[in-house]
UniProtKB/Swiss-Prot annotation:
MF-aspect GO terms: gap junction channel activity involved in AV node cell-bundle of His cell electrical coupling; monoatomic ion channel activity
Subcellular location as annotated: Cell membrane; Cell junction, Gap junction
Designated name of the protein: Gap junction delta-3 protein
Principal location class: membrane
Region called Disordered, residue ranges: 223-278
Gene name per UniProt: Gjd3
Transmembrane segments: 25-45, 77-97, 137-157, 189-209
Organismal lineage: Eukaryota, Metazoa, Chordata, Craniata, Vertebrata
UniProt cross-references to InterPro entries, sorted A to Z: Connexin, Connexin_CCC, Connexin_CS, Connexin_N, Connexin_N_sf
Segments on the Extracellular face: 46-76, 158-188
Amino acid sequence: MGEWAFLGSLLDAVQLQSPLVGRLWLVIMLIFRILVLATVGGAVFEDEQEEFVCNTLQPGCRQTCYDRAFPVSHYRFWLFHILLLSAPPVLFVIYSMHQASKEAGGAQLAPPCARGRAEAPCSPCALRARRARRCYLLSVALRLLAELAFLGGQALLYGFRVDPHYACAGPPCPHTVDCFVSRPTEKTVFVVFYFAVGLLSALLSVAELGHLLWKGRQRAKLLPPPPPSPSLPSQRGDPDPFGPPAYAHRSPAGDSEGEGGSGHSKASLATVRQDLAI
């Protein structure tokens, strides 16, 4: 149970970035899959090979028939299913933690746009938020693909019913051998339940994917246009190409004023450069 608790804590961190539909998917994942499989599934399928009985004493025949009846154990198939479904959300959590650590380390070096104008479409905060939304959208899409792939695999491998009787023929069995499965009704109920949970999870993933795409379009419509690039106001008119050069009328007092104006222009250039760097 320690491994399940660790996986549950990682998945629980996803709800901070998830909408309501994503949180419903997380509840189904934690309760109806991880909890049920860890408590009930192990008890139902732990002795399936030991209780798989065939009416023959031929060495190796029972093991071969069991392998033909169940190419992959139900329990191990569902374990791999849960691990693969958990991979995209866990990777998104790792990405979010990495971005949070980078922001915490560079908070003092953040430009003014990131501190005072985070709603600007070109600000670093807006870019980071857009990048996080795209990563979450990708994780939901990968989760949906994994869900559909495993639902198809379960239907092809096992179907929806565990038969109590299995007729096995072929080497090393000398003839057609009758084999019997333990607790077939209980296993059938569990197989149908797990498939229904998978369908519900896939529907929630489709709904969440559609919700995220719709929210992205609405956000793009409401996004304000980027502000125009700032430019330095002209202090003087255009020089006369036929007039005397400006330095011909310079006076000592004008030189001192020019030095002050030069310092002011440098300060303005520094301010504009800082704004343009945002």
